[in-house]
Amino acid sequence: MTDSITDLQSDQRPDRSYDFASAERRWQLAWTERACFTVPDVPDPGARTYYVLEMFPYPSGQIHMGHVRNYTLGDVVARYKRAQGYQVLHPMGWDAFGLPAENAARERGVHPGQWTWNNIAAMRGELQRMGLSITWEREFATCDPSYYGHQQALFLDFLKKNLVERRESWVNWDPVDETVLANEQVIDGKGWRSGAPVERKKLSQWFLRITDYAEELLAGLDQLDRWPERVRVMQSRWIGRSEGARLRFPLVEPLGDQREIEVYTTRPDTLYGMSFVAIAADHPVAAALAAHHPALAAFVAECRSLGTSEAAIEAAEKRGFDTGLRVKHPFCDETFPVWIANFVLMDYGTGAVFGCPAHDQRDLDFARKYDLSVTPVVLPSDQDAASFTIGRKAYDGDGILFNSGPFDGLTPDAARREAITRLEAMGWGQGVTNWRLRDWGVSRQRYWGCPIPIIHCDQCGPVPVPADQLPVTLPEDVTFDRPGNPLDHHPSWKHVTCPSCGAAAVRETDTFDTFVDSSWYFARFASPHAHVPVLKEAAQNWLPVDQYIGGIEHAILHLLYARFFTRAMADTGHVPVREPFAGLFTQGMVTHESYRAADGRWLSPVEVTRHGETVVETATGEPVQVGRGEKMSKSKRNTVAPGEIFNRYGADAARWFILSDNPPERDMEWTDAGAVGAYRFVQRLYRLAEAVARIAKEETNRDDASSDAAMTLRRMTHRTVAAVTEALEGFNFNVAVARVYEFANALTEAEKKAAEPGMTAARVEAITLLSRIIAPMMPHLAEEMATLIEQGPKLVAEQVWPSADPALLVVQSVTIAIQVMGKLRATLDISPDADQDSVIAQAEADPNVVRALEGKRVVKRIYVPNRIVNFVIAG
């Protein structure tokens, strides 16, 4: 038998007693008509509120399986909390500005706005097919002036609070496209679109002063106990607090007004091991020298082609240029060379470092390359000072200082403190706290973004746009037929009158980094139609977000910017909280096998066919190479279209498989077999409910007595309710799925004893409660099952979460193993409360155990409560 990897023909399916397509449409309409998911901006006093939010999507045009997983997880939480009696805010919006829309305009001749809104319509339809319990009336897109106008107002409030600054900074400049490139858009030193060599260029940029909050952002991580530890660690490292020293090295020969080079270091204890000073290519000393040294100027230009990110600089080969300058050591009479190095960043510390090759690998590699001295000054505890040398690896461990004059014999920590004390006493430096975090440059030279609400006047300088003139909207009549920012080229949009003096002026043509749009959207959802950015009463009730869900790839920038924005909004009177997200869950990726033809072409799942263990290209019959499950990507064509999955198996089956495969924080592999299995399970549950409903209608005389079989089923029902509740509380959704599978097996077994007293009532109860506990995961099927057994006028979506009967959770008996010398001889059913002596006595009386112990001397009796008895015999 052969079948397409992603296709399941109708004749391969079991009988479809459950028409998922019509059921899903019917129940989605019912939820909408009854406003099941609508909540007010300001809930009634005393109402319990819960805010669950998944990171909103970029409207690329179609959802992918990663979206399906993300929004399924959030919907489970939202439906579960709603059933628990909470008023649940579960909104959806669109992160709608960004470069892809401009690329579409250039490549396809369609306006970015039209492209974006068409994509939103398509993706909204696909998301609605999932049956998400979204409050759709709160939907917005960040490209709508009704949203970004409030963003402009926030920016101006931040400006008044001195949280905004305009200054020059180095950027990656594409000279062909005439635009600034983000670090990730620089590929091997070239622009990702134009292929032109990238230049580092100084431009005036707007910055948000996130560094003002560095200390608070770092300290606040300790309070986020419902965030993954690895995310908190990543943010802590990004903020990067370090204790060190700023020290000044006098130049042996002054360079104009430059008489010294200031260095920041976290290791002043290693000063006696210094070998050189390295400065950034953008350092003032380098600039002064470049004006008169062509070779040095060429090296500086080469450094500027690396890009501005730490990652790009770290990955590049470490290279340097000897300036010929030398500096004096603060503690001795030695002098050391000054090099320009391509690994030193101007915007970290002071733009200069001293190199201690013996105890820093990067410095050691540099020193070996340029034949600079290497002097160890920290001696490992197991080494001898006379023989210790540095080979290919720098030593960065603990030890005792040597070769360090007055610091000899001190630990590195003690030497660090002593070095700072001496530097301060000599006037050559001081201890300081430094931060890796840099202020956030938010200027982008693009059209499709939120306009920065500033007007530039030759007389007044930068002037804020008056509040009554917001929003500053984008012009519609733009063209993309030339490089650069269309706003710069527009004939009229930027030409305005200065609001302060009335003179001719121009608008700011830069737009905001799209991370600004996503740094406060969660707050807008609390009152999306308010005349202010956030209605204070709504923020008081809904913020912070109780549960935020999204990918680990946003662990640093988006989450850190949102934490900063929340603090800035609090300090400007907009929100009453300082943290945006009380709880954070980072889900794993959805992966899929990849398929490659013999000629190297990547094939999509619909282009291959499986013959047992062999996979071939359907068109040619040739075998294909099957790759391991990896992230779905267009480049490898291993994507699966959610819409096709919904058509074939239904939304509930897709949701069920998404939840069942792995713990949600891990990656999951999408497989055809898994989707088929989920589809069949949906059909199986429906048939179980159908059978119970039929018997319940036929049976007129119900016996109030309950047989052992009925009580066994009831106990299983309530234990399942308790187990699923516990699993959902702990985000162990795959465990909840497993418990439902077990319960379905128990229901199937119960069919064999359908005639026993009380069994019909027990089965009706089982289906009733089952429909409630699967509702967060398979909401359409839950409604359909409840209808079959005529549950009542309320929808399952309106029902309260069931509580397990404590009396039915009590374990009546447990089965334990009886072993002799570790070998199983018998089993024994006992009360879970039975004492050890009685259990051992019962075990010793078992005939099989009696025979095994006959003529033997028992030297030890081991009892593990409710699990095992083991008899140890002599010899």
From Swiss-Prot:
InterPro entries per record: aa-tRNA-synth_I_CS (IPR001412), aa-tRNA-synth_Ia (IPR002300), Leu-tRNA-ligase (IPR002302), Leu_tRNA-synth_edit (IPR025709), M/V/L/I-tRNA-synth_anticd-bd (IPR013155), Methionyl/Leucyl_tRNA_Synth (IPR015413), Rossmann-like_a/b/a_fold (IPR014729), tRNAsynth_Ia_anticodon-bd (IPR009080)
One Gene Ontology biological process: leucyl-tRNA aminoacylation
Keyword list, A-Z: Aminoacyl-tRNA synthetase, ATP-binding, Cytoplasm, Ligase, Nucleotide-binding, Protein biosynthesis
Paired cysteines (S-S): none
Main location: cytoplasm
GO molecular function: aminoacyl-tRNA deacylase activity; ATP binding; leucine-tRNA ligase activity
A Pfam family it matches: tRNA-synt_1g
Motif ('HIGH' region): 57-67
Binding, ATP: K634
Lyase in keyword set: no
Residue positions of motif 'KMSKS' region: 631-635
Annotated EC: 6.1.1.4
An annotated GO cellular component: cytosol
Record-linked CDD domains: Anticodon_Ia_Leu_BEm, LeuRS_core
Subcellular locations according to the entry: Cytoplasm
Catalytic activity, reaction form: tRNA(Leu) + L-leucine + ATP = L-leucyl-tRNA(Leu) + AMP + diphosphate
Keyword flag NAD: no
SUPFAM superfamilies for this protein: Anticodon-binding domain of a subclass of class I aminoacyl-tRNA synthetases (SSF47323), Nucleotidylyl transferase (SSF52374), ValRS/IleRS/LeuRS editing domain (SSF50677)
Family: Belongs to the class-I aminoacyl-tRNA synthetase family.
Protein name per the record: Leucine--tRNA ligase
Organism expressing this protein natively: Granulibacter bethesdensis (strain ATCC BAA-1260 / CGDNIH1)
Organism taxonomic ancestry: Bacteria, Pseudomonadati, Pseudomonadota, Alphaproteobacteria, Acetobacterales
Primary gene name: leuS
